[in-house]
UniProtKB/Swiss-Prot annotation:
Entry keyword annotation includes Signal: yes
Protein's name in the database: Lactase/phlorizin hydrolase
Regions crossing the membrane: 1884-1902
Active site: E1067, E1274, E1539, E1750
Residues bearing attached sugar chains per UniProt: 370, 514, 824, 936, 948, 991, 1037, 1176, 1240, 1281, 1509, 1657, 1684, 1762, 1815
Source organism, top-level taxon: Eukaryota
Membrane topology type: Single-pass type I membrane protein
């Protein structure tokens, strides 16, 4: 049944047939049409006898592109057609061939002339051409992407065709296959939209033809499928409303010979069309016509008679089905009517086997039984049909892992693993961990160039219990991400609903033996169709159900391990079949119309052949085997709805045994009807073959073979594999395909070959799977034979498997993957095997052709319209004006300098990677390559290269082009910058010796890059001079200018038609200085005073010479650009305020980059500072002239302007300081007169990580040389022997590229591209292989040099896909208000602010003791006075009023109330302070939030053990009781403990906090924590039981936690580490209180395991009794939560002997270097983590009411009132809290930490958290509001962030009494690089951060106006307004 979307086309285009359709001349001869020409037809007609596959008229492969000269036999062929009464011939034009550019302005004239010649040949043979404008594939063009563009382009193309061929053509068709054209349109998923597009295009062509070309007297139509017409008979009234758009109706007609209706009757039915219309049968397909049936001639005669007799308005039809064309060496090709009717399918004709036996199996056996081995194994050199799909498969349980992730339920395979049933006790719990790696797996597919990916969906991953319920969101998200990634990479998803992994919950109800599972499966399938069907168009209901039935329920080898072959296996299969049929009908009825997909089933089968080829019994047994294996499922679906008749064997054996040995269920008649035809395709998987004999002595055992009555064997000559059941029998797949086609699909349905492969064993070579390479070659070639020679309609070939996985009972011992997976590494790295490259090659060739199939990829284009233009001929000033870069940025605060910027680069930005020949190619002496200076150098002893390494092999890229291309595709790079080895193509350096093999290598590389849509950027010289040229002096010899030009000229001529970006030299500074000054690089010359200048002089002139050669000889034709790559570090003045350092920094830049750039980009001469300095020093050295050579005026003019773009390589930055070096001996280094100082010291890295230097360097280049196009051609970080998790490199690229983005977006630098150094690990010069720069790890110890992706290789493609670093949707700013009644608060703590440490009877606390202990507190600070809040109640209340908060959270000093910690004595003076303070708060309308304990334990209690002494629980309860009694009438918000984690872990673990205990880190923290929890619970119960009723307050605890993100989200261990981090920090105390009264399981498990592992007899973590658990559980009224930052967590295994909290947690943490820093080393600004951890609290603890009781950020250094960093922090974090509210988190309040600067524990007063500055230089300690205080006050007044689009909000107006804050320190503050007065800075601050506007007189007014301009629809603004020099 054709898809119903054709209704739209019919109704919108063809209902109103034009009146011209009825004017067809009555005397016009009847049309009998043949054609068109196809590649197969031409091949068959041109083949000598014996080479033809069959007599083919219109083959099944690509239509023939017109190429001159036309085949010589065409004239004879056309004449024979005319002699056979053929009158017309179909010709298919190629749109893409005629208009290669897409525009009729530039047609391919050769193609036009070719088609005219073809049409004229037809006319000469008296055949009338019938021309189709668009047969299948429209040309790929970016223009088609635009809405409405297709119709315009098609009209343009049609006009050209009418003009060019109209004099030769009278009959035109716009489209002949609508469905295939739609599939090739950009928006094919929207079928209705695509059909409307074609309708518009057709109408345009029709109108143009009849308006402009009516004089030609022709007709125009479009081809439709005939079976749609009866269902779509139009209403006459509707027809009148539609204008005509065809002259006659053209149909694609299929007819079944065995149909009840005759063909004439079928034609007569078409006459019911209204209005009456002439009908032409464009294609006549005769199906299911047996060779012994009606003769073709009689059928043809009956057709003609019916037409004449019944006056059927049929003007003609296709006669291909009645023609037979032959050719031999002696006669010309000829065609005639045939007497043996061909069986024509939708795409091809299949020749029936003559005189074949009755059954399909016997006919197949007869066709191949007598083949000789030579004939059977002959290799077919041919290609698959166009559109053939190449794919790869996996199964969910094989690869996903993630067994306990995000709510996923267990499957039967999880249960199977728990039984330790698999080899090596392997389980599927982690498998290949694909659950965490969807992007990585898709990248692998992209690398192979797969077109389809067959994967399965985990049923229990979506529905944990199998039944319809709330789906698992994380599971849905995983598959959405996978599918979206596939489509982004142009890979078609083929989703399997069931691949053996039934939810265990359903298995416990009987599994597939329980009828209810069918309903459950239907619900699951319906959800998948609804959720994913908008993108998935190929569905598989069941994958290999035979395996599930046989091995799962028959032999019990597979899960669920049930052994019942006679009963269970048949019952399971029965229910699977019913589930499949109902699922297909579900899709057909409810989803097909909208989604336009296809649903099938994948069945597996071996091929069976008789053991005794002459035995009829064995032949019958073999046929029975096939029906038992394949027919068991295929026959009901594809034949008649019931099991095959061979199932009678079951009845037979039951009768023989006298009891039911097996029971085959029966289908009802309704079920049979449901089953029959319930598939859109047959999926087939096949691995091996079997020899079958009749069963020997039958027994009454219920084995599979015994029930089937056969016995299985293998030929011992068949090669073995690692699997005992797979033998290599390639020809079996061809025979099986032919059988399946004849028995089941019969040409009506396509076959998708959905599984084929073989495993290698663990003991085999990990990467060289040559045996599998052979397997694929043989098997795929047999599939090709089935398609080409047997004409089986196979649409795909899908390899098993993409990666190694869990193979059920065999565990991980058998490896099917094209990619090897290292299961011993937690990150499960994937490395390509040899077979991956082979499969790619087959895909690229679409089979086994000598040439790759041209895919016409969209070319990556770089914009070269704006090239560098030198307009200023003046030399640079000294120092240059580019020093503005220093002035512009030197005063930036660190926070502003490093703040991450969100944005994208220009659309055509070139993202690439770089390499160089000596470093990667190897093949140092291969195929005639000559030696280079690096070959000579590395083979010379004592060369200084680490480990005596050489580049002889390196990465072996010379021999592994496929491997390099694989990883380039995987990375999605748009460009590849590589270098040509001079000595590889000119072994002696001269063009008299050209090495063809070397040239061929680069041609293959360049061609492959272009074919893969990767832009080649080619460097001519990357330090590897041919040794033969060095022998004549190398670059000291001026003759190299001419020789280099000769080499370059050859490269331009040979490669320039494809290479459009050239660089002459890479980093000439390195080659010159390291090769001729220090001499550490070849040619190892040490003459530092003269030779660097002499050599550079020649290099510059050589560059200029080559530039002019390209410019004069090649540019006009090749249209490329040419430049050179320069390098330098950024030079930052050590003291930007010291002019000498500024000049020294500029001098360094001029002596490095300017040395070469100044002559080329400036004035043709060296920088004046170089000439001045070297000249003066030469004179001081008593030399007659400067050591720096001079250019003549002619040379200056020749050199000046010899670069089109600016390419530079950069890695790091250095501090530069002026220095006066020695004069002698003369040296280039000393000439610079400076000293370099490293910015920081890092170990294990090649370069210091100084990303901000990139932005400054780019700005310097812009200022120095003008704003010319710039390409960063190298940038990367080298690491010493890094792991695959190279997080440091990710941070490096992330921050460096972000600085480049700032330069582009904020500073206007014309940056066009970025190339990462380097693609893969390589030979790193003197460091050999010890320093690794590669995005890919290369194993240099393995002969094949396998490449494995590092984490950075996963990060970089995402950068490319996003074209930069756009703001993530979740990070977009959210405008809105918090809920009414939301609490805004500020916080402090007693010891941190009160002071008065011995006043009025206060007792000592542990912090008094700790701070008076030497070396405990930074700067020897203490809290004796602190902020003196004890004496400043009024001042503190005023500070709170400044903020406008409704609440204030403070703590009570235990020792101020109870000096010795007990109730023996209550200090009334201390209590009075709190009463007075609380009263003052209440009087000011501020509600107190009181923390009972904030770390300051009375020292008297610590003296008896503190929190390690269990008696403290009662002491704390008594202390709390005093507070409840005395203050409870005023205080309604109580917090028992603040951050117990810090108390326990830092006070009793690390000892960095009071009481400073660190010598029992494995026990003390847990004991203290245990008592803290019990103390909290007792205090809560006290309040709940005694005080709550009369006081009406609430009480809970404040728990602190960072958020933990996995360092590598794709690494399962890192994911688990992040969870452990949060559970050990926040869950330690939250889990007992808010969950179940006990510690988190991960804590209990890890601490117990480590305790026992250390020899202890129990866990170091104390246990709660059951009564304690009950008493602790639920002791909360709300969740008090403190949060400041986020970490990146990863697993770290400590030795068992280590006993500590950190060792137990087993987690290490780092920070992303792009995260803004604060004044605290541990606190990085990470707003996103705030929302995530709030959501975690919601999910983990059932969404309790949450109050954020602390959140803030610190600063260090000189105090400033303009705390822009804190405003950024508060704005970002509070906005994330607002988002959490929108996530339904029950957030009730927010508290800023802190109200004022205070004593910050061990750091003293160095870290300032306060929104009020406390001026400690003033004895009165005034509280001065910072800008952040006023910002926070605005948020409080507004209760959030008013939407500017809603107009000005009153809350944004400053209160009238708000006075500007005067600074106690300075009158001006720096703001974004400017010095502003406090008032101006404050205004600018509010403008920038609070309201995102530039310049403000009225804050609210401008907010309103900017909001109106920027708001688009309902979208939230996603980017701040940015200062040109700010990253804010």
């Amino acid at each position: 049944m054709e898809l119903p979307w054709t209704a739209l086309f019919l109704s919108t285009v063809l209902l109103g047939l034009s009146c011209q359709g009825s004017d067809w001349e009555s005397d016009r001869n009847f049309i009998s049409a043949a054609g068109p020409l196809t590649n197969d037809l031409v091949l068959n007609l041109n083949y000598p006898p014996g080479k033809q596959g069959s007599d083919v008229v219109s083959g099944n492969t690509d239509h023939l592109l017109c190429q001159q000269p036309l085949p010589s036999f065409l004239s004879q062929y056309f004449s024979s057609l005319r002699a056979s009464q053929v009158t017309h011939y179909k010709v298919l034009l190629s749109w893409a061939q005629l208009l290669p550019t897409g525009s009729s302005k530039n047609p391919d004239q050769e193609a036009v002339q070719c088609y005219r010649q073809l049409l004229q040949s037809l006319k000469d043979a008296q055949l009338e051409p019938m021309v189709v404008l668009c047969h299948q594939t429209p040309p790929t063009s970016s223009a088609i992407q635009r809405e409405g563009a297709f119709a315009d382009l098609f009209a343009d193309y049609a006009t050209l065709a009418f003009q060019s061929f109209g004099d030769l053509v009278e009959i035109w068709f716009t489209f002949s296959d609508l469905e295939k054209v739609i599939m090739d349109l950009p928006h094919k998923d929207l079928k209705a939209s695509a059909l409307q597009t074609l309708s518009n295009a057709h109408r345009r062509a029709f109108e143009i033809y009849h308006r402009k070309f009516s004089s030609q007297g022709g007709k125009l139509s479009v081809v439709l499928k005939a079976e749609d017409i009866p269902e779509l008979l139009p209403d006459p009234a509707l027809a009148a409303l539609v204008q005509g758009s065809v002259d006659f109706l053209s149909l694609d007609l299929s007819y079944e010979c065995q149909s009840v209706a005759t063909l004439p009757q079928k034609l007569s039915e078409l006459q019911n069309l209204e209005p009456k219309v002439k009908v032409f049968i464009y294609t006549l397909k005769l199906e299911d016509c047996p060779a012994t049936g009606t003769s073709p001639s009689s059928l043809l005669i009956s057709l003609l008679e019916a037409i004449n007799k019944d006056q059927i308005q049929t003007v003609g039809f296709d006669v291909n089905a009645f023609l037979s064309c032959t050719s031999n060496s002696e006669e010309s090709p000829s065609c005639s009517l045939t007497d043996s009717l061909a069986l024509q399918t939708e795409q091809q004709q299949e020749t029936a086997v003559p005189s074949s036996p009755g059954s399909a199996y016997q006919r197949v056996w007869a066709a191949f039984a007598n083949q000789s081995r030579e004939e059977r194994d002959a290799f077919l050199q041919d290609v698959f049909p166009e559109g053939f799909l190449w794919g790869i498969s996996t199964g969910a349980f094989n690869v996903e892992g993630g067994w306990a992730e995000g709510g996923r339920g267990p499957s039967i395979w999880d249960h199977y693993g728990n039984l330790n049933a698999a080899e090596g006790q392997a389980t599927a719990k982690v498998a290949s961990d694909s659950y965490h790696k969807p992007a990585s797996d898709v990248a692998l597919l992209r690398g192979i160039r797969a077109q389809v990916y067959k994967f399965s969906i985990s049923w229990s991953g979506l529905f944990p219990l199998g039944q319809k319920s709330t789906p698992n969101r994380q599971g849905v998200a995983y598959y959405n991400k996978l599918i979206d990634r596939l489509l982004d990479s142009h890979i078609e998803p083929m989703a399997t609903l069931f691949h053996w992994d039934l939810p265990q919950a359903l298995q416990e109800q009987g599994g597939w033996q329980n009828e209810s599972v069918v309903e459950a499966f239907l619900d699951y399938a319906a959800f998948c169709f609804s959720t994913f069907g908008d993108r998935v168009k190929l569905w598989v209901t069941f994958h290999e159900p035979w395996v599930m039935s046989y091995a799962g329920y028959g032999t019990g080898q597979h899960a669920p391990a049930i052994s019942d072959p006679g009963m269970a296996s048949f019952k399971v299969a029965h229910l699977i079949l019913k589930a499949h049929a109902r699922t297909w009908h579900l899709y057909d009825l409810h989803h097909r119309l909208q989604q336009q997909g296809r649903v099938g089933i994948v069945l597996n089968s071996d091929l069976a052949e008789p053991l005794d080829r002459k035995s009829p019994q064995d032949l019958a047994a073999a046929e029975r085997f096939l029906h038992f294996m394949l027919g068991w499922f295929a026959h009901p679906i594809f034949v008649d709805g019931d099991y095959p008749t061979t199932s009678a064997q079951i009845q037979h054996i039951n009768q023989q045994c006298g009891h039911p040995l097996a029971q085959l269920p029966e289908f009802t008649e309704a079920e049979k009807r449901l089953l029959k035809g319930s598939a859109d395709f047959l999926g087939l998987s096949h691995y091996t073959s079997r020899l079958i004999s009749k069963a020997g002595r039958q027994t009454c055992t219920s084995s599979y073979d015994n029930i089937g009555g056969f016995s299985q064997h293998v030929d011992p000559e068949w090669p073995q594999t690692a699997s005992p059941w797979i033998r290599v029998v390639p020809w079996g797949i061809r025979r099986l395909l032919r059988f399946a086609s004849m028995e089941y699909t019969k040409g009506k349905l396509p076959i998708f070959l959905a599984g084929n492969g073989m495993p290698v064993g663990e003991e085999a070579d990990l990467f060289d799977d040559s045996v599998r390479v052979n397997y694929f070659n043989w098997y795929i070639n047999e599939v090709l034979k089935a398609v080409k020679e047997d004409l089986v309609d196979v649409r795909s070939y899908i390899v098993r498997s993409l990666i190694d996985g869990y193979e059920g009972p065999l565990g991980f011992s058998q490896r099917f993957g094209l990619y090897h997976v290292n299961f011993n590494d937690s990150s499960r790295p994937r490395t390509p095997r040899k077979s991956a490259y082979l499969f790619t090659s087959i895909i690229e060739k679409n089979g086994f052709s000598a040439k790759k199939v041209k895919r016409n990829p969209l070319p990556v284009r770089a914009d070269f319209t704006s090239r560098a233009r030198v307009t200023d001929s003046l030399p640079s000033e000294v120092p240059s004006k580019a020093k503005i870069s220093v002035e512009k940025f030197s005063k930036q605060p660190r926070f502003e300098r490093d703040l991450f910027y969100d944005g994208r680069f220009r659309d055509d930005f070139l993202w690439g990677v770089s390499s160089s020949p000596y470093q990667i190619e190897g093949g140092w002496n291969a195929d005639g390559k000559g030696p280079s200076i690096w070959d000579n150098f590395t083979h010379t002893p004592g060369n200084g290269v680490k480990d005596n390494a050489t580049g002889d092999v390196a990465c072996d890229s010379y021999h592994q082009l496929d491997a390099d291309l694989n990883i380039l595709r995987t990375l999605k790079v748009k460009s590849y910058r590589f270098s040509i080895s001079w000595s590889r193509i000119f072994p002696t350096g001269r063009n008299s010796t050209i090495n063809k093999q070397g040239v061929d290598y680069y041609n293959r590389l360049i061609d492959s890059l272009v074919d893969n849509n990767i832009f080649p950027m080619v460097t001519l010289f990357h330090w590897d001079l041919p040794q033969a040229l060095q022998d004549i002096g190398g670059w000291e010899n001026p003759s190299l200018i001419e020789l280099f030009d000769s080499y370059a000229d050859y490269c331009f001529k040979t490669f320039g038609d494809r290479v459009k970006f050239w660089m002459t030299f890479n980093e000439p500074w390195c080659h010159v200085v390291l090769g001729y000054s220090s001499g550490i690089f070849p040619p190892s010359v040490q003459e530092p005073g003269w030779l660097p200048y002499k050599v550079s002089h020649i290099v510059i002139k050589a560059h200029a010479r080559v530039y002019h050669t390209y410019d004069e000889k090649y540019r006009s034709e090749q249209k490329g650009v040419i430049s050179l790559s320069l390098n330098t570090h950024w030079a930052e003045p050590k003291d930007p305020g010291l002019q000498r350092d500024v000049e020294a920094a500029d001098r360094m830049l001029q002596f490095t980059m300017g040395w070469f750039a100044h002559p080329i980009f400036k004035n043709g001469d060296y920088p004046d500072v170089m000439k001045w300095t070297v000249g003066n020093r030469s004179e001081l050295q008593h030399l007659a002239s400067s050591r720096l050579p001079t250019f003549t005026e002619e040379e200056k003019n020749y050199v000046r302007g010899t670069a089109d773009v600016f390419c530079h390589n950069t890695y790091t930055s250095v501090f530069v300081q002026h220095s006066t070096p020695r004069l002698n001996p003369p040296s280039y280094d000393d000439d610079m007169e400076l000293k370099l100082i490293e910015m920081n010291s890092s170990t294990g890295v090649m370069h210091q990580d100084v990303p901000w230097g990139t932005r400054r360097l780019l700005n310097w280049i812009k200022e120095e040389y003008g704003n010319i196009p710039i390409y960063i051609t190298e940038n990367g970080q080298g690491l010493e022997n890094p792991t695959l998790d190279d997080t440091e490199r990710i941070f490096y690229h992330k921050t460096y590229i972000n600085e480049a983005l700032k330069a582009y977006k904020l500073d206007g630098v014309d940056l066009r591209g970025y190339s990462a150094w380097t693609l893969m690990d390589d030979f790193e010069w003197l460091l050999g292989y010890t320093m690794r720069f590669g995005l890919y790890y290369v194993d240099f110890n393995h002969v094949s040099r396998p490449r494995t992706a590092r984490a950075s290789a996963r990060y970089y493609p995402d950068l490319i896909a996003n074209n930069g670093m756009p703001l993530a949707r979740e990070d977009e700013f959210l405008y809105g208000e918090f809920p009414k009644g939301f609490i805004w608060s500020a916080a402090s703590a007693s010891y941190q602010v009160e002071g008065a440490w011995r006043a009025d009877g206060k007792g000592l606390s542990i912090w008094d003791t700790f701070s008076h202990t030497p070396l405990r507190i930074g700067n020897d600070d203490n809290g004796d006075v602190a902020c003196d809040s004890y004496h400043k109640i009024a001042e503190d209340v005023v500070a709170l009023q400044n903020l406008g908060v409704s609440h204030y959270r403070f703590s009570i000093a235990w020792s101020r109330i109870l000096p010795d910690g007990t109730t023996k004595f209550i200090n009334e003076a201390g209590l009075s302070y709190y009463v007075r303070f609380i009263d003052a708060l209440l009087a000011a309308g501020i509600t107190p939030q009181v923390t009972i304990y904030h770390w300051d334990l009375p020292q008297a209690l610590q003296d008896v053990g503190g929190w390690e002494n269990e008696t403290i629980v009662q002491r704390f309860k008594e202390y709390a009781d005093v507070l409840f009694q005395r203050l409870g009438d005023r205080v309604k918000f109580w917090i028992t403990l603040n951050e117990p984690f810090v108390i326990a872990a830092q006070g009793y673990g690390t000892g960095v906090s009071a009481p400073g205990i660190s010598f029992r880190p494995g026990t003390a923290p847990y004991i203290a924590g245990h008592n803290l929890i019990k103390a909290h619970a007792e205090a809560w119960h006290l309040y709940n039981d005694v005080y709550r009723a009369r006081q009406g307050g609430t009480i809970s605890i404040t728990i602190s936690s960072d958020w933990g993100e996995p360092r590598d989200p794709t690494n399962r261990e890192h994911v688990e580490a992040a969870r452990s981090y949060v559970q050990f920090m926040g869950g330690w105390f939250a889990h007992p209180i808010f969950k179940n009264g006990d510690y988190p399981e991960v804590m209990k498990t890890r601490i117990r395991d480590r305790s026992l592992g250390a020899g202890l007899n129990k866990s170091r973590l104390p246990e709660f009794t059951e009564s304690e658990k009950s008493r602790i559980k639920g002791t909360f009224d709300f969740f008090g939560f403190n949060h400041n930052t986020t970490v990146l967590a990863y697993n770290l295994d400590y030795p068992a002997a280590f006993s500590s909290f950190d060792a137990d947690r087993g987690v290490a943490s780092i920070a992303d270097s792009s995260w803004p820093v604060s004044g605290s080393f541990w606190l990085k600004v990470t707003p996103f983590g705030f929302r995530r951890i709030l959501n975690w609290l919601k999910e983990e603890y059932n969404n309790p009411p949450i109050y954020v009781t602390e959140n803030g950020v610190s600063r260090r250094g000189e105090p400033e009132l303009n705390d822009t960093d804190r405003i950024y922090y508060l704005r970002s974090y509070i906005n994330e809290a607002l988002k959490a509210v929108h996530d339904k988190v029950d957030l009730r309040g927010y508290t800023v930490w802190s109200i004022m600067d205070n004593f910050e524990w061990a750091t003293g007063f160095a870290e300032r958290f306060g929104v009020h500055f406390v001026n400690r230089s003033d004895p009165s300690l005034p509280r001065i509001p910072r800008a952040s205080a006023k910002f926070y006050a605005t948020i409080v007044r507004c209760n959030g962030f008013p939407d500017p689009a809603q107009g000005p909000h009153p809350c944004l107006q400053q209160p009238e009494d708000a006075a500007p804050t005067a600074s106690p320190v300075q009158s001006e503050v720096p703001f974004l690089g400017l010095m502003l007065g406090i008032a101006e800075a404050q205004t600018a601050l509010y403008v920038l951060f609070a309201l995102l506007l530039l310049g403000a007189c009225s804050l609210a007014f401008l907010t309103y106006n900017t909001g109106r301009r920027s708001k688009q629809g309902n979208a939230q603004p996603s980017q701040h307004q940015l200062s040109p020099i700010s990253s804010f």
